[in-house]
Amino acid sequence: MITEIGIVAGEIWNFLDTHGTVSLEELARGIERPQEWVLMSLGWLAREGHVLVDCKDDVYTIRLREKQKKQEVGNSTF
């Protein structure tokens, strides 16, 4: 089961990387996996900090978290 969750998480990542911000419904349709697998995998990605989940007017949207850019000052990196 853990392996399958990881596989679906990878599919979610690739879908979001290609499509940007999508609704939960669009995501579930787009990767053509059972809703239970999508939700478990999405939870994993959210817990690991890889995706952001927002809700407005009872519609959930999901997007990849942007990589934080390192700020360089002199010889120090923050």
Segments predicted by a language model, with ranges:
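A short, conserved structural fragment
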Residues: 46-56
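Short glycine/proline-centered loop/turn elements that form peptide/ligand docking sites
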Residues: 1-2, 44
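Short amphipathic alpha-helical interaction segments
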Residues: 33-44
